[in-house]
């Protein structure tokens, strides 16, 4: 009996999660093994943008 309530609550979030999931899957594919560098790259880019 709980299933309809759960699916109603989760469904809108699921649509967002699917989009996020696709985006993060692409990101993981592009930067596999490079994830530690992402933060540094962002930091360097924001430093460049400030100058």
Curated annotation (Swiss-Prot):
Q: How does activity depend on temperature?
A: Irreversibly unfolds upon heat treatment. Between 50 and 65 degrees Celsius, the protein shows an intermediate fold. At more than 65 degrees Celsius, the protein is completely unfolded.
| Gene Ontology biological process terms from the UniProt entry | defense response to bacterium
Top-level taxon of origin: Bacteria
* Reported impact of residue 43 to A: Loss of Astexin-1 production. No change in thermostability
Q: What is the effect of changing residue 42 to A?
A: Almost complete loss of Astexin-1 production. Is unfolded
* Entry keyword set: Antibiotic, Antimicrobial, Isopeptide bond
UniProt entry tagged with the keyword Transport: no
Q: Residues of crosslink Isoaspartyl glycine isopeptide (Gly-Asp)?
A: 29-37
Q: What is the effect of changing residue 42 to W?
A: No change in thermostability
The signal sequence is none
- Propeptide regions on this chain: 1-28
Q: Where is this site: Important for stabilization of the lasso structure?
A: 42-43
What modifications follow translation?
A: This lasso peptide is probably hydrolyzed to a linear form by the isopeptidase AtxE1, in vivo.
Q: What does this protein do?
A: Shows weak antimicrobial activity against its phylogenetic relative Caulobacter crescentus. Does not show activity against other bacteria tested (E.coli, Vibrio sp, Burkhoderia thailandensis, and Salmonella newport).
Task: Please state what the annotation says regarding this protein's domains.
Answer: Is composed of a ring composed by 9 residues, a loop and a C-terminal tail. The peptide is threaded when the C-terminal tail is inserted throught the isopeptide-bonded ring.
* Identification of the protein by name: Astexin-1
Query: Gene name on record?
Result: AtxA1
